[in-house]
Structures are given as C-alpha cells and as structure tokens.
From Swiss-Prot:
SUPFAM superfamilies per record: GatB/YqeY motif (SSF89095), Glutamine synthetase/guanido kinase (SSF55931)
Gene name per UniProt: gatB
Protein name, as recorded: Aspartyl/glutamyl-tRNA(Asn/Gln) amidotransferase subunit B
UniProt-listed Enzyme Commission number(s): 6.3.5.-
Cited function: Allows the formation of correctly charged Asn-tRNA(Asn) or Gln-tRNA(Gln) through the transamidation of misacylated Asp-tRNA(Asn) or Glu-tRNA(Gln) in organisms which lack either or both of asparaginyl-tRNA or glutaminyl-tRNA synthetases. The reaction takes place in the presence of glutamine and ATP through an activated phospho-Asp-tRNA(Asn) or phospho-Glu-tRNA(Gln).
Organism: Bordetella parapertussis (strain 12822 / ATCC BAA-587 / NCTC 13253)
BP term (GO), one: glutaminyl-tRNAGln biosynthesis via transamidation
UniProt keyword terms in alphabetical order: ATP-binding, Ligase, Nucleotide-binding, Protein biosynthesis
InterPro entries referenced in this protein's UniProt entry, alphabetically: Asn/Gln-tRNA_amidoTrfase_suB/E, Asn/Gln-tRNA_Trfase_suB/E_cat, Asn/Gln_amidotransferase, Asn/Gln_tRNA_amidoTrase-B-like, GatB, GatB_C_1, GatB_Yqey_C_2, Gln-tRNA_amidoTrfase_suB_CS
Pfam family, one: GatB_N
Length: 484
C-alpha cells in the first residue's frame, strides 16, 4: 500500500521585546537562574499581568506580512495544566479569538514553489525551564531544578493547516518562516537559545483517502535537520505500526537526536482537557485601524515583494530571487553588487553570491554579515571578469585570496601582485595556438575527423601553455579559425 504523510506545524516564535509579555522582567538570555522573574512571573498573590504593547505590535506586523486578518478584538485565555515550571498552574494564551487569523506563506522546495495556508497566530507566554541533570540531593538521589527566567517570555505561536506532504516540504516552510520573522525583526531566530521552536503534527493515510489518520505531536524541535529526521522517523513508525496490525495512539512525543527516534512523552490532550476560559485579569486586546496603519507604514519591503522586484528589475529567475532574499542582509549584499556592475550583469552577480560566496560562508559557518569580502570588493572582482582582465577561473583564485585578506582583500592588487592579468593579445595567443597545433598533429586530425573531445584537448593545452591566463573566448575563436 502507498502511504501519504500529512504534516502541520506549530511554531513558537519568541518575540524580540526587552521585557516579558505580562511583566517588566527582562527577557535577556543567559542570566543566572531565577534572577529575571518578578512577582507576576512567580504568581505571587496580588500580582496582576499587564500586556506588553511591543509584543502586540510584533504580532500585528507578522499578520500584515502574511496577509492574515488582524483581529480588532482578541481575548487572552487561561490554559489550565500542571507542570512544575508553570507557577500559576495555567498558561496565559489565546484560544477562541487569536490576534491573527489566516494568511499564507510561500517558499521553494528545490525549484518548485509551494504555498501553505496559516490557520492562526496567537500570543502567549512561555513557561519556565526544568533542569534534570545538574542537581542531586545530599543523599545522592536525583533531583530537578526550576529556572523561571523564561516564564512569561512573549511567544507568537504560528499554526499551519495540515497541508504539507513531506519532511522536506515542512523543513522548507520552517526555514521560510524563520527567514521572515528575522527579516521583520520580530524574532532573533536563535534556535540554540530556543527563540524558534517547532511542534510537528504528523499522521499518515493511504494515498487517495480523504480522512486524516490519527496524529501525533512531536514537541519542541529546535533544529531544521532534527525536524526533518523526526518527521521521517515518525512517519515510518506509524506506517510500520499500521501495517503490522497496530493502531496509532494520539499522543505527544519527543525526538531523541542521539538515537534518531521519537519516544512517547504523554497522551495528547484535546482542547477541552485544558479548560480554556477568558482570563479575568486581562482585558481584551483591542487593535484599532489606526494602530494597524501605523505598523504597516513602518514595514520593511517584504521578501515576496523584493523577490518580484529582483525578477523584474534584474531579470533573475524566480529560484535565484528566492535564494537571494532568504535574509535582508543577503538581499542588500546582492543589490549592492548588482548596482556596481554594468546593466544586464546582475545574473553574474547572483551566480557568484549563490556559488562561491555561499559555499565559503557555509564551509566556515558564517552569515553574510561576517563575510570578509564586501559587496563593493566582490563587484570589483566581477567587473574584472566583465572587462576581460581575468577569466572566471582565475577569478575564483583571486576570490579565495581576497577572502583570506591577501593584499588587503583588494582584487586589483592581488591580480597585479600575482601577475594574473589575462592575455588578450590576439598575436600572442595565435602564436601559442600555432605551437600547440604543430606539436599535436594527431589530435588535429582527430578533430577534423569529427571528434569534439579533440578540440577540448587542444584548448586545454593552449591554456596550459598560457598558464591559464589566455582569454578563453579568444582562444576558442582563434583555434576554430586556424583549424578551418
């Protein structure tokens, strides 16, 4: 039987406010345990929550960016459950009336563009953190510690429709969402610090069946690689279970990266288990049109708009435009290079950034902001290819030297110091061709007999004689003339 995977994601995006969503405590990461939790966070008697305006504005900005409906009135609700790192005994979230409803997010899986519908985005507070490995009692018995620094940190939970059909598609969506929230400046995107965490709802069904299978939820995956592996494992587990005559249980599972498997955490609750009801300590969040308009006026150019502009203004393919707008820094870098080149050469800039620059950044695990070759310096290098000073092959060597800081990272200085200027004198190139032809009569005859590989062999020997500095285009043209 052929099976189809059905995936929906719930992403907890930590909003980049200086203080918590309902208290004035700092959200700074890495402070000593329990030093950033005040009376509200600790749920001390008499303390009352006060809504953080900055968190609401970031939610509005996200809603506008994805084309969702920003609710003029949304309500905070108490989500009731017991956990040691939840001092109040409930989490303040949103249930029936979220701050954002609907919206879409487009992204590429390989070179295929996909669009996923969003169900909602709602504001809520984070819980604290339980630490199980660092503590023990005097008797040596294991113990757990509670750090409430994270309790009350503002989150925007973004929920998709169950429309994704592969782990690769889910990861591509998550990457696109991560890029968007960082682009908007509403989240720092630091997955190691827990600023961007995904819950994956996974089920399987026979191909062609309309009804969904029983889903499981994989909690708090904070790596794109782990997200893909967790979904793949869980889908295989469910398929094998069903084919062996078993039944999938609705439950919450955790992904164990060391064993590359998911394991049961607890039975999956339904909404009624949490006994949601409006929080009596918080008034409804009322968002007037003037507030929405003010947020819209301050919006940056969105990735989708910039992609369309790159396609229209620079003639880039859709895939290239998408790759160059994964971050604002990358988009700005490309545009700075493209503007410094002659008209019609933007594709060459895109090729270099998506090729040599991206490969070197990945190898060194750096972001474009940390690239030692500036946009202006790269533009100078590409201009030397365009004006015939060096070949594309030599340019790669020059780029490596620029990256390493040779001659101050100046392309012209490196070309001069290494004597790399391309030979474009037709007389000098012609003389080299004559020497190679005279030394290789057998290869010449093979070419004249129709073997194209022979031509490539001759070109290679000419370039070797020129130490790679002959203009490749001129070599090809003059060689064809001499061979007749």
């Amino acid at each position: 039987m052929n099976w189809e995977i059905v995936i929906g994601l719930e992403t907890h995006t930590q909003l980049s406010t200086d203080s918590k969503i309902f208290s004035g405590s700092s959200t700074r990461f890495g402070a000593a345990p329990n030093t950033q939790a005040n009376a509200v966070d600790l749920a001390l008697p008499g303390s009352l929550p006060v809504m953080n305006r900055g968190a609401a504005e970031r939610a509005i900005l996200f809603g506008l960016a994805v084309g969702g409906k920003v609710a003029p009135r949304s309500v905070f609700a108490r989500k009731n459950y017991f956990y040691p790192d939840l001092p109040k005994g409930y989490q303040i979230s949103q249930y029936e009336l979220p701050v954002v409803e609907g919206g879409t997010l487009s992204f590429f899986v390989g070179e295929e563009e996909k669009t996923v519908n969003l169900t909602r985005a709602h504001l809520e507070e984070d819980a604290g953190k339980s630490l199980h490995d660092e503590f023990s009692l005097a008797s040596g018995a294991p113990a757990s510690g509670i750090d409430l620094n994270r309790a009350g940190t503002p989150l925007l939970e973004i929920v998709t429709e169950p429309e994704m059909r592969s782990a690769a598609e889910a990861v591509a969506y998550a990457r696109a969402l991560h890029s968007l929230v960082v682009w908007l400046g509403i989240c720092d995107g630091n997955m190691q610090e827990g600023s961007f965490r995904c819950d994956a709802n996974v089920s399987v069904r026979p191909v062609g069946q309309k009804e969904f299978g029983t889903r499981t939820e994989i909690k708090n995956v904070n790596s794109f690689r782990f997200l893909e592996r967790a979904i793949l494992f869980e889908a295989r587990r469910q398929i094998e279970l069903i084919e062996d005559g078993g039944t999938v249980v609705q439950e919450t599972r955790l992904y164990d990266a060391d064993r590359d498997e998911t394991r049961s955490m607890r039975s999956k609750e339904d909404a009624h288990d949490y006994r949601y009801f409006p929080d009596p300590d918080l008034p409804p969040l009322v968002i007037g049109q003037d507030w929405v308009d003010a947020v819209r006026a301050g919006m940056p150019e969105l990735p989708t708009a910039q992609r369309a502009r790159f396609e229209a203004d620079y003639g880039l393919p859709a895939y290239d435009a998408a790759q160059l707008t994964v971050s604002r820094a990358m988009a700005d870098y490309f545009e700075a290079v493209a503007r410094a080149l002659p008209a019609g050469q933007a594709k060459l800039a895109a090729n270099w950034i998506m090729g040599e620059v991206a490969a070197t950044l990945n190898r060194e695990e750096k972001d474009i902001d940390a690239a030692p070759v500036s946009a202006a310096a790269l533009a100078t290098l590409i201009n030397r290819i365009i004006d015939g000073t060096i070949s594309n092959k030599i340019a790669r060597d020059v780029f490596a030297a620029m990256w390493a800081g040779e001659n101050g990272g100046d392309a012209d200085a490196i070309i001069a110091a290494r004597g790399l200027k391309q030979i474009s004198d037709s007389g000098a190139i012609g003389a080299m061709i004559d020497e190679v032809l005279a030394a290789n009569p057998a290869i010449v005859e093979e070419y004249r007999a129709g073997k194209q590989k022979a031509f490539n062999s001759l070109v290679g020997q000419i370039m070797k004689a020129a130490k790679g500095k002959a203009n490749p285009q001129q070599v090809n043209e003059l060689l064809k003339e001499k061979l007749g």
